[in-house]
């Protein structure tokens, strides 16, 4: 497909990973994906639950020893004692399952619904609605299972991914680029890009083009993870002035980058955002971009 600005998006097989402990903001899903789930190039994975007939697309829980490869034993035990633990494990399992299937070529890209975010979870700390760092766990898993070597992570949540920064700052095989207010510094392959308090859609996408695209082209990751939050949208709790249209603009640019540098392998992991109506409005068109519509 060719858009008015001349950009192109290639068709792709897209996986959608969902479970039913997602919280109020995702109450309208998966019903809100009507017209998407019926496509031949869309594959829907969800958790097995009592009364659901087993299918080839069930989401299985990862073992805890995979979590311990990224987080301390004490931290895992603290999370285990919370009432959110089951949903946390399903969220992380979705990210791991998506990365395995994208890597193996079963699907080209993926969107992972999570009830609990990623990027505030560090080695021994969690907060801000983030318990385990699913992207970091998925990266570790790909290294062990497939000998994968180079990864890129772009974070467009409105807040700094302090947990991801801590985990990746000394890892020379992970390019981590975070767009957030108060950025403007880098360490090894960790880059914080400063975003003004108020920013236009075009300015924000330009930050991706100038700060992530050339680094990804030079770094040549084998797969890209996108920590996507919609909390920076107008009317959300992290409002930085972005319109609802900005998210499909980001998706088109990041899919283009993935198509060019890593054979289209990109996994979108839902992070911040609280409004139910906003999720219903933003997520379906973003997934359509992944499919190549």
Which ranges hold each PLM region?
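Sparse, context-dependent recognition of short Cys/His-centered cofactor- or disulfide-binding micro-motifs
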Residues: 14, 52, 60, 64, ...
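A general "terminal functional-core" signal
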Residues: 71-293
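N-terminal low-complexity, Ser/Thr- and acidic-residue-enriched intrinsically disordered segments
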Residues: 1-62
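A general structural signal for well-ordered alpha-helical segments in protein cores
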Residues: 26, 64, 92-95
């Amino acid at each position: 497909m060719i858009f008015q600005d001349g950009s192109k998006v290639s068709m792709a097989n897209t996986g959608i990973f969902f479970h039913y402990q997602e919280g109020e903001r995702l109450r309208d899903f998966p019903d809100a994906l009507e017209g998407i789930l019926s496509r031949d190039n869309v594959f829907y994975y969800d958790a097995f639950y009592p009364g659901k007939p087993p299918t080839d697309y069930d989401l299985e829980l990862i073992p805890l020893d995979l979590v311990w490869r990224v987080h301390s034993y004490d931290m895992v035990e603290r999370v285990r004692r919370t009432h959110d633990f089951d949903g946390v494990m399903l969220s992380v399992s979705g990210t791991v399952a998506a990365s395995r299937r994208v890597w193996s070529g079963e699907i080209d890209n993926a969107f992972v619904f999570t009830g609990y975010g990623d990027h505030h979870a560090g080695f021994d700390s969690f907060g801000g609605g983030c318990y385990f760092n699913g992207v970091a766990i998925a990266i570790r898993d790909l290294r062990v299972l497939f000998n994968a070597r180079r990864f890129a992570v772009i974070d467009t949540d409105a807040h700094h991914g302090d947990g991801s920064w801590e985990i990746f700052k000394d890892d020379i095989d992970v390019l981590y680029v975070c767009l957030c207010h108060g950025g403007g510094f880098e360490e090894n392959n960790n880059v914080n890009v400063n975003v003004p308090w108020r920013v236009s859609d075009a300015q924000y996408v330009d930050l991706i083009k100038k700060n992530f695209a050339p680094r990804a082209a030079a770094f040549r990751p084998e797969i890209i993870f996108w920590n996507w939050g919609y909390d920076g949208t107008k009317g959300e709790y992290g409002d930085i002035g972005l319109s609802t249209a900005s998210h499909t603009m980001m998706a088109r640019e990041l899919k283009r980058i993935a198509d060019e540098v890593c054979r289209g392998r990109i996994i979108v992991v839902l992070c911040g955002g609280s409004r139910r109506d906003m999720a219903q409005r933003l997520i379906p068109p973003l997934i359509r971009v992944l499919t190549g519509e």
